[in-house]
Amino acid sequence: MASDDRPLALTLGDPSGIGPEIALAAWQLRGERGVPPFQLIGDPEFLEATAYRLGLSVPVAEVEPDDACEVFPRALPVLPLPSGAKVIATPGAPDSANAGAIVESITAAVDLVRSGAASAVVTNPIAKFVLTRVGFAHPGHTEFLAALAAREGREPPLPVMMIWSDTLAVVPVTIHVALRRVPELLTQDLVERTARIVHADLRARFGLEHPRLVLSGLNPHAGESGTMGTEDRDVLAPAVAVLRSEGIDIRGPLPADTLFHERARATYDVALTPTHDQALIPVKTLAFDEGVNVTLGLPFVRTSPDHGTAFDIAGKGIAKPDSLIAALRLAHRLAHRPADTVLPFPVRA
């Protein structure tokens, strides 16, 4: 299969959430919204039943990996789970009985990309509590994908979560951890490694020749010279100094409360923040329906919608597919970007 003909591999996500219905909606809008060919890895009968229940005119076709692009114009290609597992799910009622299928879909998507049968992985939302009940040991999707990406006998790569939109791109240095643990986890080494990966992937994946980064402070006023906490002075500032000595264009630590207004955003390409919510609050405020989660640092392209399972609205036919469509489109563009082009990024000054 020629590389340009490879479809995206879309995971099932939690079948009790909105993932299946936004996948169906994305296929319906394929022409109108320029959705690239994708195959969903799951249970074809479940997807067919979901479409029927929602009153969607979406034909579902069971496919082999090589058939997806040929089938995509006329039906939603669904690749059965390798185990042949069937999915039984009630919208809004997460069930650990589906944990195996959820994990198997993710693993199969990565295997498709690594074998060359798919160009990139796009993941539908999962609920970690559903998986931890059956022994899932990873903090989230991002960390699990890093483990899958590890070569045998080697440590998993450091996965970096970037939330991208046309308005703002952000990277939390610490991800799915309790706030009280951030000071112990926020080391100079972690900041440096994260920034290096962001810098390298902006160049390699997005085609930005000279990426501009900023780092927000952890404490109010970026610590104000140590009077409001010492992490900014003793951890973040030294990390920035080392990175700048390596030729990376990064500024900081800067007060987080003045980092995300329009004029400030025009001065950088990506903002790194010490905590998860420092990054996600501004980007979800500015681009709630259009944000895309891009995992940097992996040997393959992975994107996902910037929202969760939304169990509260699952099955009601009101979930918007916008973020999933943005994730599919960005994954395709990243996987197929010509070497001499630059992908659109938040507006530069």
UniProtKB/Swiss-Prot annotation:
Positions of substrate binding: H141, T142, K284, N293, R302
Q: In which pathway does it act?
A: Cofactor biosynthesis; pyridoxine 5'-phosphate biosynthesis; pyridoxine 5'-phosphate from D-erythrose 4-phosphate: step 4/5
Q: Which reaction does it catalyse?
A: 4-(phosphooxy)-L-threonine + NAD(+) = 3-amino-2-oxopropyl phosphate + CO2 + NADH
Q: What is this protein called?
A: 4-hydroxythreonine-4-phosphate dehydrogenase
The note on the cofactor says:
Binds 1 divalent metal cation per subunit. Can use ions such as Zn(2+), Mg(2+) or Co(2+).
Which organism was this protein described from? Methylorubrum extorquens (strain PA1) (Methylobacterium extorquens)
**How does this chain assemble?**
Homodimer.
Spell out the subcellular localization from the entry.
Answer: Cytoplasm
Q: Which UniProt keywords apply?
A: Cobalt, Cytoplasm, Magnesium, Metal-binding, NAD, NADP, Oxidoreductase, Pyridoxine biosynthesis, Zinc
Q: What else is known?
A: The active site is located at the dimer interface.
A single GO molecular function, which one?
magnesium ion binding
Residues bound to a divalent metal cation: H176, H221, H276
Kindly list the GO CC terms recorded for this protein.
cytoplasm
Q: Which GO terms describe its biological process?
A: pyridoxal phosphate biosynthetic process; pyridoxine biosynthetic process
Q: Which HAMAP family match?
A: PdxA
Q: Per the UniProt record, which EC number(s) apply here?
A: 1.1.1.262
Q: Mainly localized where?
A: cytoplasm
Q: Which gene encodes it?
A: pdxA
Which cofactors?
Answer: Zn(2+); Mg(2+); Co(2+)
Function field: Catalyzes the NAD(P)-dependent oxidation of 4-(phosphooxy)-L-threonine (HTP) into 2-amino-3-oxo-4-(phosphooxy)butyric acid which spontaneously decarboxylates to form 3-amino-2-oxopropyl phosphate (AHAP).
**Which InterPro entries has this protein been placed in?**
PdxA, PdxA_fam
